[in-house]
Amino acid sequence: GESGEWATTVVDSAGGQERLQFDWVVDASGQGEAVTRLLGLPSGDLHGLKTNTVAVFSHFDGVKSWDALLAEERQDTKDFPFPADTSAQHHVLEEGWLWCLRFDHSVTSAGLVLDAHSLADGWQQIPAEKMWRTHIASYPSLNRMFQDAQLSVMPNRFIKTQRLQRIAGQATGQGWVSLPHTVGFIDPLHSTGIAHSMSGVERLADIFLSADRAHQAGVDAYGEQVLGELRLIDLLVAGCYLALPSKRHFEAYCMLYFAA
């Protein structure tokens, strides 16, 4: 764009002001979608996305050791590359999956990601705690792991999200561009967000550092790529949720993700 296409005033803690002008804004605000909100641009159409999931989560104290539970059941863990309790645990369920992240100070972050297609009508009205306890109680091993757990001081409540998926109507515009996580989010399954964001940073750096001054064309092409990539991730993730009731089919479909 033309020099000084964007302008802002920065106010420091002492009240001093500095006016800045710049050619490009890179929106790295994620779910905040700062630029699209500032410009009043519409969100994308979620009806085109096949993945439809919600999460119920919190932080807990006193979650039992999964390694100890496996040992009690005499499960063979000699092929495990590391102890289960020191890794990011993913417990695959028929209607979704559970993450379990044990921090060094004994607090555990745990959450259910559930396929909304498998939930009963009216799930939006079910309290978060009831949803959590109902699903955990359906799996005896998980019920044992959480039977003595208490909510941590923070946030000290169960949190239920609305639909996790979001996608922007556009990823770029005149003088602005969004990083992939700002453009959209599909699902925490497979943890695609970090790698996708890093690839966006790398591609935009190549565009802006190139000798070619026609940055807008390169940025627009990048934006179309990112929107297409989000829709591909949607297909990969949605297929995994469809296959979840069958361990064999779920594992086979996951291979498409690893091949991609």
Task: Give the positions of each predicted feature.
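Predominantly flavin-linked oxidoreductase catalytic cores and closely associated redox partners
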Residues: 1-144, 201
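Poly-acidic low-complexity segments
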Residues: 27, 61-64, 215-218, 246-247
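A general marker of short, structured functional hotspots
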Residues: 18-20, 218, 237, 253
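C-terminal auxiliary extensions adjacent to catalytic cores
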Residues: 244, 248-260
